[in-house]
Amino acid sequence: MSENNNEQFKMPPKRPRGPMGRGPGMITEKARDFKGSTKKLIKYLGRYWAAIIAVMIFAAVSTVFSVAGPKVMGKATTALAEGLMNKIAGTGGIDFDYIAKVLLFTLALYVVSAIFMFAQGLIMTGITQKTCYRMRKDITSKINRMPMKYFESRTYGEVLSRITNDVDTLGQSLNQSITQIITSVATLVGTLVMMLSISPLMTLISLVILPVSMILISFVIKHSQKYFRQQQEYLGHINGQVEEVYGGHLVIKAYNKEAETVKTFKEANNVLYKSAWKSQFLSGLMMPIMQFVGNLGYAGVAISGGILAIKNVITIGDIQAFIQYVKNFTQPIQQIAQVANQLQSMAAASERVFEFLDEEEEDITVENPVKPDHIEGSVEFSHVHFGYNPDQIIINDFSAKVKPGQQVAIVGPTGAGKTTMVKLLMRFYDVSSGAILVDGHDIRDYNRADLRDAFGMVLQDTWLFKGTIMENIRYGRLDATDEEVIAAAKAAHAHHFIQTLPGGYDMELNEDASNVSQGQKQLLTIARAILADNPILILDEATSSVDTRTEIRIQKALDNLMKGRTSFVIAHRLSTIKNADMILVMKDGDIIEQGTHDELLAKNGFYAELYNSQFEE
């Protein structure tokens, strides 16, 4: 890292993360293939079609009863108005019995509507949650069948968002959109029919306001979209900056870069403020515009209704019902617009989910697989060629024979292909040409699970999960007893420090295992590998994260562990592999030297150059 204070400060590298949360007014993401994604989703929902049809029927019936309410209520208003007029004229009174019957009938309509609405909501929620449950299960199962190259070409957040963000978005949109479409369309049609039954003239007057409101709303949306996009873009920038600063706060403090960090944040925050203010202001205009246009409609209906009532064409109750219908008429239009956005979100989310489910899988099993009772541990690389891309071969004609129980060290500069060889051995990738044999059988003739059961691994990047230390070590062999776990910890020289921790083996590690040191993490993963007791071991910089004193203790434990087992050790510190039975020196994907430590030093070749360079100072 540069120590030049004049150089512009750069944030620590970004950690993989999923999509940012949706901010207010975020532009709805659209699917690339809306029709295709919708077809796949409909097919996926096939087992629930009977329930979905029931939901549609219940939603329609609920809406019919609800729409009928205002007109029935209008009869009570008319009866009340006529009764008052008769009472004033002295020709009669108010018929409260009739009004009571009308009100009870109206109440019954709304109760029945609510019952059907409750039923359809209950059924639809069940469909949605079952779909999300099944989809998460399918995605999780799919992850276990995916090739390693898929995950290495994507961030963790991108993959995990399929299970979290995309499935949640799909579930929420699915739950709301189906019933909302049926309800809104039924309400729109039913309301229009009721309005026409009361007065075609008043219906025409009320419909004239719709184009006006649409034009005004379209104008506002058109001018606010660019600010919404900018708002969401800079919201993502700010979220990213906050996460990076939090992850690298020690580096920032160490280099006294707090002021530069705050300045960078303020610049992005100012842009976010301006775009958010404009977008929210323009967005806030829509409701006043709708209310203003709606009031114009009410005024038109009131004037025309009053004239028609004077002429005895319609009653006062009809005017009251019609005003209610005008109010209800604009609501489903707004709901349909919202549903259109939900459908776009649902299609986009389902598209990403189905794209993932349609990804190419690796072959988990093979026909007539090799199933040896016991793997001895002989390994042969026979003229192996490999490239992550077909047109870029990085390992060229790699050949080596390893006898059972031998300790093989693989050394070389960064990018020489050391870790790639391990990935090929574990069948995380398949060779482009040539073959890798274990106990004389091509590893492609083994089921992947059977092959990987033969390997124990300790990697440079430690992985521990949230749970107790005992559970983390036992992950190497789930049926191991507590005594076997403790014995493995002792062999890995981890027992002593575990006993000093609060709770000992029952201490709970947090999500990132940040409540133990990096060296302690490595000791725990070594204990896990010892417990697994696999015939073939892979150690990729297994002692790189511990101090020299701890390294010596671990190296002794590993020497005992590797006796009688075939071991592949990838190391940059060449002092740790002096006792290896064979050292393979790699450069640019090829083995350029092979032999023991002393033999290679005597050759005074590339290995000797690497070894001496580590002790020059």
Protein language model regions, located:
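Short intracellular "coupling" helices and adjacent cytoplasmic loop segments at the cytosolic face
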Residues: M20-E29, Q129, K137-S161, N165-V167, ...
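Hydrophobic alpha-helical transmembrane segments of ABC transporter permease domains
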Residues: G46, L104, F116, Q120, ...
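ABC-type nucleotide-binding domain
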Residues: S2, T365-V366, P372-E617
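An intracellular "coupling" helix at the cytosolic face of ABC transporter transmembrane type-1 domains
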Residues: M148-K149, V167-L174, I178, A186, ...
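A short amphipathic helical element positioned immediately N-terminal to and/or at the very start
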Residues: D33-W49, V159
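Transmembrane helix-loop-helix hairpins at lipid-water interfaces of multipass membrane proteins
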Residues: I52-F116, S197-L201, N312-I316
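Helix-loop-helix
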Residues: M194-V208, K278-E351, F356-L357
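Membrane-proximal cytosolic tails and large cytosolic loops of membrane proteins
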Residues: M1-K35, A89
